[in-house]
Regions:
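TRNA-recognition modules of translation machinery and tRNA-sensing kinases, especially anticodon-binding
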Residues: 1-175
Length: 175
C-alpha cells in the first residue's frame, strides 16, 4: 500500500488545520491465479482521508457517493467485514453482479455468487498513523484501494479483466 508514504508527504496539512485527502494511482504486480476477475498486473487507485473525528460512516458515505457518481446510478452495494493489516476495522465493498444478477451459477465474473468484490477499505490503524508521525488520539482517517481495471470492467460490461492486457486492437479501439 502507498498510504504511509502519502500520510508522511501531506501530514503538514494537519498542522495548518487542513485534512489529508489524496488519491494515488499506481501499477500493481501480484502473484495471482488468473481468471475473469484477477490479473497479475493491474492499475490500482488508493485513497486516504485524515482529519479530526473521521469515522466509519464517513468512509462508507464517501465510497457510496463516489460509486454512484462514477456509475451514474444508485447501486446495490454490500459492505462486509474483512481483514487488511493496515486498517481496523476493515471492509470489503461488493457490487451486485451486472452480468447475471446472481441468477447464473456458471457466471465467470461472480462465480454464481451474485456479488463482485470491488474494493477494500477501512479506518487507518493507529500504528500506521504513528509511523507517519500523526497522533492517533487527535486524528483518525480512512483508506481504500480499488483496481481501476475492475471499475472499468463493471462500468462497461467487460466480462473478463484479462482483455485489458491482451493487446487486441478490436477490443481497445472501442474505448
Amino acid at each position: 500500500t502507498m498510504q504511509n508514504r502519502v500520510l508522511m508527504k501531506y501530514r503538514d496539512n494537519l498542522e495548518k488545520g487542513e485534512a489529508i485527502a489524496a488519491i494515488v494511482p499506481d501499477r500493481v504486480f501480484r502473484n495471482e491465479d488468473l481468471d475473469a476477475r484477477h490479473e497479475h498486473t493491474f492499475y490500482q487507485v488508493e485513497g486516504v482521508y485524515v482529519s479530526r473525528r473521521v469515522n466509519v460512516g464517513n468512509l462508507i458515505a464517501t465510497l457510496q457517493e463516489f460509486l454512484q457518481e462514477y456509475y451514474g446510478k444508485k447501486l446495490d452495494v454490500r459492505v462486509n467485514p474483512f481483514y487488511f493489516p493496515f486498517t481496523e476495522p476493515s471492509f470489503e465493498f461488493a457490487l451486485s453482479c451486472p452480468f447475471c444478477e446472481g441468477k447464473n451459477p456458471d457466471c465467470k465474473v461472480c462465480s454464481g455468487e451474485g456479488w463482485i468484490e470491488l474494493l477494500g477499505c477501512g479506518m487507518i490503524h493507529p500504528n500506521v498513523l504513528r509511523a507517519a508521525q500523526i497522533d492517533p488520539n487527535g486524528y483518525t482517517g480512512f483508506a481504500f484501494g480499488c483496481g481501476i481495471d475492475r471499475l472499468v470492467m463493471m462500468k462497461y460490461g467487460i466480462e473478463d479483466v484479462r482483455h485489458f492486457e491482451s493487446g487486441k486492437l478490436d477490443f481497445l479501439e472501442q474505448f
